[in-house]
Design a protein with these regions (language model features):
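Outer-membrane beta-barrel "beta-signal"
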Residues: 118-126, 139-151
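Transmembrane beta-strand segments that form the barrel wall of outer-membrane beta-barrel proteins
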Residues: 1-9, 37, 62-69, 93-105, ...
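Residue-level signature of outer-membrane beta-barrel architecture
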Residues: 23-25, 83-85, 118-122, 133, ...
Length: 151
């Protein structure tokens, strides 16, 4: 999805954008991959971006291996790569790697999160449990739990 808006704040024009792209691809009957990119940001044309307009990121939705909303910046991007294996039952396992940055060049300054996940999918809900580590604190892993209702 893509969202772009703009306007005036305190006499300065701004543009705010949000972009999310993902592609899912089967490798074999039981093995699949996912590539995802999220970018959000705001740019003020004649004044600095106020901290109240910063974007928050980190955690299960954007950069696993870190606390929920651990980082804030005028803009950020996170790229994710996942490889998943689906058993014959409703259980799926996956390995993942997230790389995030608050700079345009994601390779220059970044945070890494990586780990393993387990999901159970049924007709009523999806339960995901992911254990993630970061490149800044290998000894402090994060457990991310997500429950999604499928009503």
């Amino acid at each position: 999805h893509t969202i772009i808006d703009g306007g005036l704040q305190d006499g300065s024009g701004f543009v705010h954008n949000e972009l999310e792209i993902q592609t899912y691809f089967p490798v074999t009957a039981n093995l699949h991959g996912l590539i995802k990119w999220i970018g959000k940001g705001i740019h003020m044309f004649s004044t600095p971006v106020p901290k109240s307009r910063y974007e928050w990121f980190g955690g299960t939705a954007s950069l696993r291996g870190y606390r929920e909303q651990e980082f804030s910046a005028p803009q950020f991007q996170v790229a994710s790569l996942e490889m998943g294996y689906k058993t014959k039952s409703s259980v799926q396992t996956k390995l993942f790697l997230d790389i995030g940055s608050d700079h345009l060049n994601i390779l220059a300054t970044n945070w890494l999160g990586y780990g393993i996940g387990l999901s159970q999918v049924n007709e009523n809900s999806i339960i995901r449990v992911e254990y993630a580590l970061s490149n800044h604190s290998i000894s402090k892993g994060k457990l991310h739990i997500k429950w999604i209702s499928r009503l």
